[in-house]
């Protein structure tokens, strides 16, 4: 299965609410910042944004004072799982990032998708990739 198939079928899928809702954007990005696969509207990283995200996995709390930035958009960092999951909130939407052995799985959502639905979709794929040694 290609990385793009993982994004298209496992991240941009129906979130399971029975109403056909799905994430706004998603991607799988290597630890070096290279994009393995992404949805058509996934925002592009600017400057130090990706390295700051990776630093927060190594030093949990790094992003809390300044916020998490994606393509210049600021997300308030909310409770995640230190070293494993970063979650952010921006208005009626947010972001979930799950770190795996070789990559980071990104999911961005807007209402009516809920934070819990985004977390479930992103973390389910992230956990699967971890089980596969990826």
UniProtKB/Swiss-Prot annotation:
Cellular component aspect of the GO annotation: cytoplasm; cytoskeleton; nucleus
Subcellular location: Cytoplasm, Cytoskeleton; Cytoplasm
Keywords, sorted A to Z: Actin-binding, Cytoplasm, Cytoskeleton
Subunit structure and binding partners: Occurs in many kinds of cells as a complex with monomeric actin in a 1:1 ratio.
Taxonomic superkingdom: Eukaryota
Tissue specificity: Specifically expressed in mature and germinating pollen grains, and growing pollen tubes (at protein level).
Residues in coiled coil: none
Species for this entry: Arabidopsis thaliana
One Pfam family here: Profilin
Molecular function in Gene Ontology: actin binding
Stated family: Belongs to the profilin family.
Chief subcellular location: cytoplasm
CDD domains associated with the record: PROF
Signal peptide: none
InterPro entries on file: PFN, PFN_euk, PFN_sf, Profilin_CS
Result of knocking out the encoding gene: In germinating pollen grain, the double mutant prf4 and prf5 reduces the amount of F-actin and induces disorganization of actin filaments within the apical and subapical regions of the pollen tube.
Function statement: Binds to actin monomers and regulates the organization of the actin cytoskeleton. At high concentrations, profilin prevents the polymerization of actin, whereas it enhances it at low concentrations. At low concentrations, associates with the poly-proline motif of formins to enhance actin filament elongation rate. Acts redundantly with PRF5 to regulate apical actin polymerization at the tip of pollen tube and control polarized pollen tube growth. Functions probably by favoring formin-mediated actin polymerization at pollen tube tips.
Keyword check for Cytoplasm: yes
Protein name: Profilin-4
């Amino acid at each position: 299965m290609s990385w793009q198939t993982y994004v298209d079928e496992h991240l941009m899928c129906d979130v399971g609410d029975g109403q056909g809702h799905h994430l706004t954007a998603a991607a799988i990005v290597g630890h070096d910042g290279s994009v393995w696969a992404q949805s058509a509207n996934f925002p592009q990283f600017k400057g130090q944004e990706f390295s700051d995200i990776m630093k927060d996995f190594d030093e949990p709390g790094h992003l809390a004072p300044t916020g998490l930035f994606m393509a210049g958009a600021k997300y308030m960092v909310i409770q995640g799982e230190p070293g494993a999951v970063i979650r952010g909130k921006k208005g009626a939407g947010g972001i979930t990032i799950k770190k795996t052995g070789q990559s980071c799985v990104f999911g961005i959502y807007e209402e009516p998708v809920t934070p819990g639905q985004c977390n479930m979709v992103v973390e389910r794929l992230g956990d699967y990739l971890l089980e596969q040694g990826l």
